[in-house]
UniProtKB/Swiss-Prot annotation:
NCBIfam families: PRK11031.1. Gene3D superfamilies: 3.30.420.40, Exopolyphosphatase. Domain 2 (3.30.420.150), Hypothetical protein af1432 (1.10.3210.10). SUPFAM superfamilies: Actin-like ATPase domain, HD-domain/PDEase-like. This is Guanosine-5'-triphosphate,3'-diphosphate pyrophosphatase. One of its GO terms (biological process) is guanosine pentaphosphate catabolic process. The gene is gppA. One of its GO terms (molecular function) is guanosine-5'-triphosphate,3'-diphosphate diphosphatase activity.
Amino acid sequence: MSQAGNSPLYAAIDLGSNSFHMLVVRHIDGSVQTMAKIKRKVRLAAGLDEHNALSKEAMQRGWDCLSLFAERLQDIPAEHIRIVGTATLRTATNVDLFLQKANQILGHPIEVISGEEEAATIYKGVAHTSGGSGRRLVVDIGGASTELIIGEGFEAKALTSLKMGCVTWLENFFKDRQLSARNFEAAIEGAKQTLLPILEQYKSLGWDVCVGASGTVQALQEIMLAQGMDEVITHAKLKRLQKQAMLADHLEELEIEGLTLERALVFPSGLSILIAIFELLEIDAMTLAGGALREGLAYEMMSELRQDDIRARTIGSIQSRYQLDSQYGQQVANLALKLLQQVGDVMWIPEPQGAMLLETTAKLHEIGLTIDFKKGGEHSAYLMQHLDLPGFTRAQKFLMGEIARRYREGLTSLPEQHALSGNSGKRLLRLLRLAVILSHRRQPSLEPEVTLSAEGDKLTLAIDAQWLENNPLTAAELELEANRQTDIGWPLVIESR
């Protein structure tokens, strides 16, 4: 593997209680690009006996996995590698025996980090990859521990690591593999008892948003999306999934639409812990974080990437990597936001994320032109939906891509999406299309003075008659756009004044 001098590789390895993970990234254009993700289910925690000693079989599973990882580490500088062990290695009484051989296999030292250090690193991973402002509560359910962190920006204000996880809760409460109400109740109550000591501190600190940063939360979101729900996790949805799980008598028979076979074994135990957290901390809603422990380790090695506005960093990186006209992107964004303000801002698009999604789509809508002009919109959609965009959720990427697909020429209705209401998504598209037409000369000083007003879904664009006469191409484009929007039930009137 050759290394370009200006984009060195970094590796972060997490020896977890359920799985071992390896993340390989490179630093490019002010952002982080994922080069490889390798995961092996080792179930280390399941190998602990009653004296907390790791079985030979569990250690061998771990060593076999590390032999695979070692090959990938050969061409990465030692100072760009971090390897950490978490809850099970903190607990194991014979950890030295495991580490001695593990260090030999990898050729690099393994750090067994404390629960508090694990929580702090998880928070860094979330802060560097998840957008949004305000105070956040971060929940990470691992195999043998659960981390809860409250922080703001890059600063953690409360860090806790609790001795409960999806593997240990499986052994403690679902040992008979029965998915009964009794087992679920016991698992939820056990988790609540574990949470009680931190309850007062966390409630007094409070938070604005809650994010989940674990395989359990990722599995839940995949299930919900597969079943046609939106990506926001709520208590009602968790209880609904508990009922679905209880339709199977035994764990081996568990089949839920969207649940992978790999996650099925520890799904009920992880679900029980999350239900307890929602109920005890009275959480309204949770979304999936963009990263956690491994991302935190990687970003710790790249301190120059620290920037408070994650989304701004992402947009800047994409504009640089794809050589977009950032000044024009800003012009379209400014005009689109001005039009949004004229039609009533949150009165017309009530969701707080609406303006941000409009601005981002405007700044990146031409990305597809780097591939081809004729199908530029299609390429824009594909790139925006498939690029790694820290700070944006999967649903947000999907909506922005679908709007960018339709930013010019032929107009079709948006498909079902879960980032905003259907009405708000449609309205963002209408504003972007108008902003693109009105700014096509790519100079802010050449834009016409316009006033956009709304009566429900009917839009009226008032524009100077003399300007229209002097700019016949734009006048024709606006007339055509009025027909296109009106034809699919979105009335648009162009009014000269």
